[in-house]
């Protein structure tokens, strides 16, 4: 299986979710967001936006993806968010998928559900097999 790269804030929702996937994990450190992963990965990212949708992608994730080596290795993105924010729900994953030319594989709310975890595990298994 491939690598999961993720960013999680103080709430820990994203970290909680990815810890249930049984995958190799790499956390983007907001103090050192320019670390290189060196292999293909799927990015799991929360959304943080104001009432106008600004600031949806965490700055540490922007810095991480601005490194050409990291950007060329992204294969897909999974987003988390809060449905209370309506059209801005999981906006970061949509922005990243579009800018990086990769699929948005799944979206989950807050910490996700057991069903979300099962769906993502199965989906990632199929996804990595398809990529070969």
Curated annotation (Swiss-Prot):
Signal peptide: none
InterPro entries: Flavoprotein-like_sf, RNR_Ib_NrdI_bac, RNR_NrdI
Stored Gene3D superfamilies: 3.40.50.360
Pfam families: Flavodoxin_NdrI
GO biological process terms held by the UniProt record: protein modification process
An example molecular function term from Gene Ontology annotations: FMN binding
HAMAP family: NrdI
Family indicated by similarity: Belongs to the NrdI family.
General function of this protein: Probably involved in ribonucleotide reductase function.
Protein's recorded name: Protein NrdI
């Amino acid at each position: 299986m491939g690598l999961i790269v993720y960013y999680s804030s103080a709430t820990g929702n994203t970290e909680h979710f990815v810890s249930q996937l049984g995958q190799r994990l790499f956390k983007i450190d907001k103090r050192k967001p320019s670390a290189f992963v060196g292999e293909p990965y799927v990015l799991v990212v929360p959304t943080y936006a104001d009432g106008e949708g600004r600031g949806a992608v965490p700055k540490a994730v922007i810095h991480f993806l601005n490194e050409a080596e990291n950007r060329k290795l992204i294969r897909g993105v999974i987003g988390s968010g809060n449905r209370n924010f309506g059209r801005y729900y999981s906006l970061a994953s949509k922005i990243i998928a579009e800018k990086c030319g990769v699929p948005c594989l799944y979206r989950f709310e807050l910490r996700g559900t057991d069903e979300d975890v099962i769906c993502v595990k199965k989906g990632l298994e199929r996804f990595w097999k398809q990529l070969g």
